[in-house]
Structures are given as C-alpha cells and as structure tokens.
C-alpha cells in the first residue's frame, strides 16, 4: 500500500515540479501607462524599462534572452530595483546582464538601488557588487537622487535604500530636490506607507516576487509587511492617490520554481 501511495505521489509531484520550473523561463513582458495628472500641458512620454529581483543564484533567463525580450522597444531609462544576488561568487555573472541592457542604449541612462539580499554580502563584497554595476554603466543610488534633463522635461530619479533592512532615509533622499517629475526607485514597496508627507509621481519596487509560490494564497509573505495584508503584492497600485508598481521580479529565491506567478520585465510609459 505504501509503495502504491508513493508511486501516486511521485506521478503527481514530478510533473508539478517540472511545470513549476518551466514557469521560471516563461517571462511576461508588461507595459504600463501612467497618465499625467499635474495639470500642466501634455508632455512627451518616457519609456522606462524596469527589472527587479534578478537573484542570480536562481535565474532561468540568460543575458541574451533578456536582450531579445526587450530590444524591440525604445528605452529612455533603465531602472533596477535591487536583489541582484546574495553570494559573492555570482558578482561577475551580473556583468553579462548589464552588458545586455547597455545594448539597448537607454537615452538617459541606467539606475539601480539595492535590496535586502544584496546586503547579505560582507561589506567588501558589497562594494565589489556596487563597483560592477558602476563599471558597466549603472548609476547606483543609496538615499540620494539625480536630476536628468529629458525631452519630456526634468526628471528627479530618487533612489531610496532598502526599507526591510532599516536602511531607508526618505528625508535624505529628498534633500535639496528641485521641481520636476519625481520617480522613486526602491526595493521594498512597504516604504510607501511612510511616504504620505512627500510627493512622488511614480514609484517602482519589487521584493515580493508576486508571491513566487502563489497557491492557493501566498501565506508565506505575511511576515513581509503590511502591504501583503492589504493584498498588494504585485502590479500597479495607488496609495493616497499616488501610483506605485511592484514587479514580480526576474529571478527566484530558495527553490527555482514559480507557481501562480511568472518572471517579469516591465515597460512603464510615464
């Protein structure tokens, strides 16, 4: 009887795992359009390519595949919202993905913030990670901002450090900020609950992986903050009428499977 039950379990479980692993290769390319609400004359839109949570320990998409997924749209800005890796041996691997993104020739550059997994690294290894990003054309932001002049007008790219590891400094990130479109990059979207007193036009984040194993419900995310309990774990949401986006990410943590979620790259038209 035990042998029969074991055989049945294997017959069910092996195809399930196979499909769950295949899901990690089935990348969805989303396009999100954010309407202008500032009351000013209509301006030219910018196209932002947003990637999050590469988790190079468990990524099923090669740099070449990433390039082919994204090459058919013009790119103005590339935004990377953290959790590149958590093991130092994978730092060199990141360069291949950054080179693929540079081939897209973003008109106004590539920008990155860090996530909780990046901070698992020892300080010297974290600095190596940061160096690889910067040597491959990426501007890293840790509670700071940069201002860029675009065909759509000035854009302030505000990079707020990871909220889940208590590294966020909202006040410091906004210090001496001038007028313009305020685009916030951060890893953990829970930070929006502490941003009611500051303005942003759009915020990009990741962290939750869309649940990764979202079946029947992503109960394992409960410990990851209030937004989960508000059923905000992926996609476009509004808080106090301000839009923010939670990417499902490109890689996986733990086991390299996805159930009820898929890896994502997103184009945001702002």
Curated annotation (Swiss-Prot):
A Pfam family of this chain: Metallophos
UniProt entry tagged with the keyword Lyase: no
Binding site residues for a divalent metal cation 2: 83, 116, 207
Sequence positions that bind a divalent metal cation 1: 53, 55, 83, 209
InterPro entries cross-referenced by the UniProt entry: Calcineurin-like_PHP_ApaH, Metallo-depent_PP-like, Metallophosphoesterase_sf
Any one GO MF annotation of this record: metal ion binding
Protein name per UniProt: Uncharacterized metallophosphoesterase YkoQ
High-level lineage: Bacteria, Bacillati, Bacillota, Bacilli, Bacillales
